[in-house]
Swiss-Prot record:
InterPro entries: ARM-type_fold, Sda1, SDA1_C, SDA1_MD, SDA1_N. Its main location: nucleus. Residues 254-315 form a coiled coil. The modification Phosphothreonine is found at T551. The modification Phosphoserine is found at S232, S234, S236, S584, S588, S594. This is Protein SDA1 homolog. Belongs to the SDA1 family. One of its GO terms (cellular component) is nucleolus. The gene is Sdad1. It is found in: Nucleus, Nucleolus.
Amino acid sequence: MSGRNNNKLPSNLPQLQNLIKRDPPAYVEEFLQQYNHYKSNMEIFKLQPNKPSKELAELVMFMAQIGHCYPEHLSEFPQELKDLLSYNHTVLDPDLRMTFCKALILLRNKNLINPSDLLELFFELLRCRDKLLRKTLYTHIVTDIKNINAKHKNNKVNVVLQNFMYTMLRDSNATAAKMSLDVMIELYRRNIWNDAKTVNVITTACFSKITKILVAALTFFLGKDEEEKQDSDSESEDDGPTARDLLVQYATGKKGSKNKKKLEKAMKVLKKQKKKKKPEVFNFSAIHLIHDPQDFAEKLLKQLESCKERFEVKMMLMNLISRLVGIHELFLFNFYPFVQRFLQPHQREVTKILLFAAQASHHLVPPEIIQSLLLTVANNFVTDKNSGEVMTVGINAIKEITARCPLAMTEELLQDLAQYKTHKDKNVMMSARTLIHLFRTLNPQMLQKKFRGKPTEASIEARIQEYGELDAKDYIPGAEVLELEKEENTENDEDGWESASLSEEEEDGEWVDVHHSSDEEQQAVAKKLDSMPMEERKAKAAAVSTSRVLTQDDFQKIRMAQMKKEMDAAPGKAQKRKYLDMDSDEESRGELLSLRDIERLHKKPKSDKETRLATAMAGRTDRKEFVRKKTKINPFSSSTNKEKKKQKNFMMMRYSQNVRSKTSRSFREKQLALRDALLKKRKRMK
């Protein structure tokens, strides 16, 4: 009889639910019976909404499951649940409140509820002190908005929700405001709400008095797009000669130290050219979408000056302000004196503050403002009373600042810093060399003659711009080589950067010279270019740029010619006997600035004894013990009497005759044993 009772439909809701989904018209009467039962339970529940009701929870889920089968009967069911949650969500039983929310989510997934009204209700429910409920609502909100914008951007719904979230960010309940901010950040990262309105709503959270909201907003703006994390070494076929081409050229030619040096130098120049095509500093799209970055940065600076938060929060504010100034090239002159107050070697996280100073430097800042910053760094860090690491950090910071604002460097300060090229500390010496190397490309005339090095074509053409000057060219630099090659009919000859593949065979078996072609006609072309004045070169380049449509091959030739300028000596000068073996990361400026650029030490400091011991012990964790364990002939045999005697409890042995009659060693025996032990130890030490 028990099996039959389980099949009775009025009392078996799961079975009735299954049958209704299969054939809704056949079970209308059973449904109406349960619906009336639900109404009566709901009326009773409204009298005491703070009491749990398991029967009501089952009926609500039953109605939500079959809501699509009888839409005309259950048209008021979703609104009734929403009203109940809206008015009584603070007093409802947690399990019953979760059931009501799950029922609404189920109805929304079946598209029986308007998304705007439901999501607004769920945002209000984020005020509840129920962590599991908040997590469930957060997941549904993000997923639902993602599904709404799956096929196309639903601007009508998005605008309503964004306006509502803007009010939620100013809500008195910190938890609800924080969850609303998390929703917007998550939707932006998923490229669902990646518009300017979302970003500017998040900017308002940067001025919140609630620390958690402030930190979340600052962390969002200090992040990076996932696209930037891709490997920067990816190369395309149209980007000129690749590293693979150079390696193939070396592999198919003669092996020798000369060709090996040529390969290394060519690889360095190639890597430098590749880095020039990388995105600029702080390429995070959210910062670019801010409507008024100048006003935003000024408000942040005002907040920073009166901020009473922890030091870490102040550092985040400084970081964001410096990024805003660096990206948008803002005029925020009060920021630099504020940063100068913290530029002391003993200051906590001083390397990060130096990084912020470099980030906030750009060519539109008046040079006298940056000069004050440079002098502060030089006076506080680059002095002989400080350690080598402190001096290195100071020179590195000066180098990064002047790379972004070259006019700020004075000739007197540069010559003083260049003298550290012969410093006894290797880190200081190498940092000074990198600074000299930087100004060889920016403005060699500021260096003393002995520090300028052998001039190249690129260094001769280099000219430092005046304050506010724009270098707008009406021609493609290097385009003059195209017309010359056309005149000399050297279509089949490359000018020193012959591309090679695995299928090519060289007649003489030698590696192609990457510096200059040995062909007589190419030498004649090079001589014509060398003898041509700079103004005539520009005129020819402008004529070529405007008179012909350049192909990919033409652009590749131009790139190769520009790369040759950085490798070859200037006209009338001898080739360099050797090139300075600089770190490849030092060769390109204006790229992504990281803390490693400020803290770079070319020679690692010696670690103390504790660090060495910790490293040694960490390496021994996976090593097996070098102790041979005694093995039995028969592993299943019992233990011997000797083993049993060793393992026996002392309390069982203390009254034994052997223990009581045991005699200890005499003083003489102990002396002899100690002597033998010391002799044995001395032999091991030898």
